[in-house]
Amino acid sequence: MIEAAMLWNEPNNKSHWDPALDPDWQRFAEHVVRAGDAIHAINPAVTRVLGGMSPIDPHWLGKMEGHGALDAVDVVAVHGFPLDWNLWPLSAWPDKIAEITAVTDKPVWVTEVGVSSFGAEEVQVFGLERTASLLKGVAPRVFWYSLFDLPMSWGAETRHREAEGSSYYRHFYLGLIREDGTPKPALETYAQHAADIGLMQWFHFHDPRLDEAVAWMKRLGTRRIRTGLSWADSFRPNAVDWFDRQMEALADFDVTVTFCFTPEHLGVAPHHTSPARDPQQFADFCAWMIDRYAPAGATSTGIAAPETPPVPPRVPELTPLDFNRDERLAAERSAA
C-alpha cells in the first residue's frame, strides 16, 4: 500500500538535479507544486514528501519555501551518511533535524540513512545501532539504505565520482546483504529495529532481486519500504508491466514511492537530472501513478498514461543493468 509519494530524490545534489540548468531551483519548485497538487487531487490521503535533501541544508529549504514548494507537500525529507560522506559526526543527527524544524513546522522524515561496510563490517553494525538510538522517536519515518549491496558492475548514480576518489566505492557496500546474497553482521542488528525503521531499496528496471527482497523483508519483520518509480523508465517498452509487478510485490508493506528522473527527450537538456521543459508533464506522470496504485476509492479512475512527444529511438539513459561504465564516466567528465 502506498502511504506516501516523494517528489524527487536529493534535488540539491547535482547527481540528481542539475543546478547549472536551474541555479535558483525555481523550476524544481514548480515541479513540486504541480506534482503535489496533482497527487492531492487524486488522493488527498497520500502523504506528499519533498524529496530528501542531501546535504541537509536549511538555506536550501528556505529557498523552497520562498518558491512556494512547501505549500504543496506535507513532509520534508532529509538524507545523511555521516560515517561515509557528510562533514558532521554521527552524534549530530538530532541537531541536523533541528536545523530543518527551525525553518518549517512540517514533519521531518529521514528517507535515507546508512553506513557502508567498505572499511569494516563492524563499523556498519555500530553505525546502525547508534543511528537507531539517535533517530527512533525523533523522526516519524526512518529508512535504512539499503537491503542489498549495489552490484559493482551497475555503477553508482553520481556525478561526483572523480571528486570522491576512493570514497566512490563506498556506494557498493551500503547493503545489509552482500552482492553474493550472503548476510552481513548488520542484518541481525537491523532485524531488532525492523518494526520501527524501514528500508530504502531502489529496484532497477526488471531488477532480478525483487522477489528475494520481499522474502527478506517479510522474514525480518520490515513494515515500511521506500522505493521508486522512474519517470524516465516509464517510456521503456512494457514499462507498466514492470511497474505493476513491482507494486504488486510490495503490496503488503507501507510504501513511500519516489517519483524522479527526467526522460531525456522531455528535459531542458537530454539528461535525467535536467528540469523538464514542461513541469506539468512530471505532474501528469505522478497523477497517473497514484491513480493506478493508490486511488482514493477502491479502484482506479482510469487515468490514461500522459500524452507526450514520441520517444526518440535511443534507449533512455538509465539502464543500470547494461550500461557501459566507461561511457558513463566520459559523460560525467563532459558535464562537470
Regions found by a protein language model. Give the residues of each.
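Structural motif corresponding to the early beta-alpha repeats
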Residues: L7-W8, G228-W231, W242-A276
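Aromatic-rich peripheral "rim/lid" segments of glycoside hydrolase catalytic domains that contact
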Residues: A120, V138, F143-G198, P208, ...
